[in-house]
């Protein structure tokens, strides 16, 4: 169970301290609730110096932020290239049914104030390796109940006895490249699923048999490859197998885990994307809004919750440092997740009048028309049909 909150008479002093650090008022209640349970935790504002709406708009570029196809319709975008108005379907942008996220859900997941709870806050935890606080025992807690727990696998003689456990490989890989092994485990579970059923680590892909990609590095849909195939193409060495960076070809799980960890350490953590949040929403450095590890808009929050499982209450009693982004011109309160569902298609497939002519000619994206009729006209009939057969049309008839 969680510890009892700190006495409320500390509240005013702590809020004053947070204000002095530069946290906006809208952050304070969530941070106080966390501090009252975990007084050793340290919260630091990470000032992006980026306008809030600018950042959200940059992440709203088609293809940068995706949601699963079964998400509520209000979570899915209808911008150009995201939705097929003719057949009322969202366009798949990545293998597995991933479609463009709506601006509203992007804003929700980008708003740090929505994730100031004892599990999701771990997306703001610094990702560096710390031998004193990151233990094999806690890693075992994180992976328990998943395919990573107590599992041995054939490493093709990359270790002295030819077998290893996922947990041990993740731990030593993290220690060797300077990244928290807890982060690596959370990433692998997020990318491969808790049951490990992803074809990325099966070794049996039809086009790239015998190759593995433990973190889905370079895995995205192209005209030639599915996302899994593109990731395995990268694992194989890419064009003609010529790529040898990061220990490629990854023809064993051992190589895929260690090589992928080294890739992540060099290209993300060392580049300043040293929290799960910044890995997903890169609002720092010279390559802002690019070099983002995933397109899943909920990825940072999801991995943060997975990461939190590694921290027992005893470990949470120690000092942990969280770097929490602050934007310029943020909304006064946290952006809620949209809740609406149903077809967004309110367009017409036809609009006709019995007398005169519409100006301009009917097109489904035009919302206003002018109608000029002869002076002697007494009545007109308006007829319209919806593009979505399940929709109804109001306002037709005789006038």
Where are the regions that the model predicts?
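Cell-wall glycan-active module
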Residues: 1-177, 269-340
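Generic recognition of stable, solvent-exposed alpha-helical segments in well-folded globular domains
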Residues: 165, 169, 182, 252-255, ...
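Short, functionally critical alpha-helical segments immediately adjacent to catalytic or ligand/cofactor-binding
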Residues: 168-196
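Generic recognition of flexible, low-complexity loop/linker segments
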Residues: 170-173, 246, 369-370
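Generic helix-packing signal
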Residues: 178, 264-265, 388
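Catalytic and binding regions of secreted/periplasmic enzymes and modules that target cell-wall glycans
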Residues: 190, 197-325
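Beta-rich interaction/scaffold domains
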Residues: 331-399
């Amino acid at each position: 169970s969680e510890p009892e909150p700190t006495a409320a008479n500390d509240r005013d002093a702590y809020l004053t301290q947070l204000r002095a650090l530069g946290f906006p008022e809208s952050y304070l209640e969530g941070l106080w609730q966390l501090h009252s349970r975990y007084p050793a935790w340290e919260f630091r504002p990470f000032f992006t110096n980026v306008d809030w709406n600018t950042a959200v708009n940059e992440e709203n570029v088609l293809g940068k932020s995706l949601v699963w196809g079964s998400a509520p319709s209000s979570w899915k975008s209808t911008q150009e290239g995201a939705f097929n108005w003719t057949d009322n379907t969202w366009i798949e942008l990545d293998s597995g049914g991933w479609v463009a996220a709506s601006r509203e859900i992007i804003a929700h997941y980008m708003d740090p104030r929505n994730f100031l709870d004892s599990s999701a806050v771990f997306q703001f935890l610094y990702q560096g390796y710390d031998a004193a606080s990151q233990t094999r025992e806690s890693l075992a807690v994180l992976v328990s109940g998943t395919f990573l727990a107590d599992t041995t696998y054939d490493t093709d003689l990359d270790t002295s006895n030819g077998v290893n456990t996922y947990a041990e490989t993740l731990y030593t890989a993290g220690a060797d490249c300077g990244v928290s092994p807890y982060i690596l485990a959370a990433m692998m579970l997020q990318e491969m699923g808790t049951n490990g059923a992803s074809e990325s680590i099966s070794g049996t892909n039809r086009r790239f048999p015998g190759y593995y990609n433990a973190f889905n590095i370079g895995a995205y849909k192209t005209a030639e490859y599915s996302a899994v195939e593109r990731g395995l193409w990268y694992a194989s060495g890419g064009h003609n197998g010529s790529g040898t960076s990061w220990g490629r070809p990854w023809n064993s799980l051992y190589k895929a885990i260690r090589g992928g960890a080294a890739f992540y350490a060099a290209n993300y953590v060392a580049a300043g994307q040293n929290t799960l949040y910044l890995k997903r929403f890169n609002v720092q450095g010279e390559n802002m809004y690019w070099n983002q590890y995933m397109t899943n808009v909920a990825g940072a929050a999801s991995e943060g919750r997975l990461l939190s499982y590694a921290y027992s209450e005893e470990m949470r009693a120690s000092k942990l440092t969280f770097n929490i982004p602050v934007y310029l011109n943020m909304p006064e309160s946290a952006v809620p997740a949209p809740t609406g569902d149903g077809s967004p298609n309110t367009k017409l497939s036809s609009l006709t009048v019995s007398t005169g002519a519409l100006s301009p000619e009917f097109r489904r994206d035009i919302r206003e028309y002018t109608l000029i009729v002869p002076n002697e006209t007494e009545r007109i009939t308006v007829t319209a049909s919806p593009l979505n057969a399940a929709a109804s049309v109001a306002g037709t008839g005789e006038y």
